Amino acid sequence: MPTLPGRLTIVKGIKPQPLVSLANFTSWRVGGPAEWFASPSSVEELQTLIAWAYEQKMPCRVIGAGSNLLINDAGLPGLSICMRKLQGSDLDPKTGIVEALAGEPIPNLSKRAAKAGLHGLEWAVGIPGTVGGATVMNAGAQGGCTADWLESVQVIDLNGEGPFELSRQELDYAYRKSLLQEKTLVVLSARFRLDPGHDYKELNQITHKNLTHRTTTQPYQLPSCGSVFRNPEPLKAGRLIEALGLKGHRIGGAEVSPIHANFIVNIGGATAADINQMINLIQQRVQMAHGVMLHPEVKRLGFEATA
């Protein structure tokens, strides 16, 4: 078992733990151990951990809901920080201003906003992620996306600089892309400006309809990461994959979902290697058949550089 390097000012509950399985912190339920793992309960604890990792010159990364991650079976070096305890949000029904910590589940925020008569996040009710992850990936569904309603984010750099604020304009948003994916920045919180004064019952009907649509057209009963590939607009990744007859195709415990071809599910006993091999196979087959390179939405950690 590794020995904790250097000196860390221990804040209650955040002493890094060695060799913690990351499979329990990803929605695919695969992945090896983190060399060091911690789950802070406050922004101050998070800052302490990031500063410690920087001082030790060790790799550092954050994990939200783990719904957009594929982690190598061999695990990850350095410090992995789980953001799930950093939850909380404030909503102003009069102005429409919503502030939420990075670990707040985006479906919870969607429901709270609807209950407060705030229109804008109904699309997010079925997104299996956190506010932080949504701002990084520009998560979206049902014709809406994070960038439509985000006003700003508060971030800290992994080199310890910050916190500081970035506006939506500074984040350079595009389809499933943002500046945050290219920088060593960790989202601490986000501010949204929603549309106030709407009827709760009407918003609730919309959120219920959106959630029903997602649960009936996507394989929610099995572990997955959500959509694996970005849509090569105006085409749909799922349709390109389905056209090749890959629905139901299996590699080990990984399967292209028979319900939605842009989902790879863990039918039991899958490894990260199985899923990674499936991703590569789909990319190769679609490229050969359609002349289109599919780019994953999912972030692969611990693997060689991939498209």
Curated annotation (Swiss-Prot):
Pathway: Cell wall biogenesis; peptidoglycan biosynthesis. It catalyses: UDP-N-acetyl-alpha-D-muramate + NADP(+) = UDP-N-acetyl-3-O-(1-carboxyvinyl)-alpha-D-glucosamine + NADPH + H(+). Its cofactor is FAD. The keyword Protease does not apply. GO terms for molecular function: FAD binding; UDP-N-acetylmuramate dehydrogenase activity. InterPro entries: FAD-bd_PCMH (IPR016166), FAD-bd_PCMH-like_sf (IPR036318), FAD-bd_PCMH_sub1 (IPR016167), FAD-bd_PCMH_sub2 (IPR016169), MurB (IPR003170), MurB_C (IPR011601), MurB_C_sf (IPR036635), Oxid_FAD_bind_N (IPR006094). It is found in: Cytoplasm. Residues 29-197 form the FAD-binding PCMH-type domain. GO terms for cellular component: cytosol. GO terms for biological process: cell division; cell wall organization; peptidoglycan biosynthetic process; regulation of cell shape. Gene3D superfamilies: 3.30.465.10, UDP-N-acetylenolpyruvoylglucosamine reductase, C-terminal domain (3.90.78.10), Uridine Diphospho-n-acetylenolpyruvylglucosamine Reductase, domain 2 (3.30.43.10). The active site is at 176, 227 (proton donor), 297. Keywords: Cell cycle, Cell division, Cell shape, Cell wall biogenesis/degradation, Cytoplasm, FAD, Flavoprotein, NADP, Oxidoreductase, Peptidoglycan synthesis. It comes from the Bacteria. Its EC number is 1.3.1.98. The keyword Coiled coil does not apply. Cell wall formation. Belongs to the MurB family. PANTHER family: UDP-N-ACETYLENOLPYRUVOYLGLUCOSAMINE REDUCTASE (PTHR21071:SF4). This is UDP-N-acetylenolpyruvoylglucosamine reductase. The lineage of its organism: Bacteria, Bacillati, Cyanobacteriota, Cyanophyceae, Synechococcales. The gene is murB.
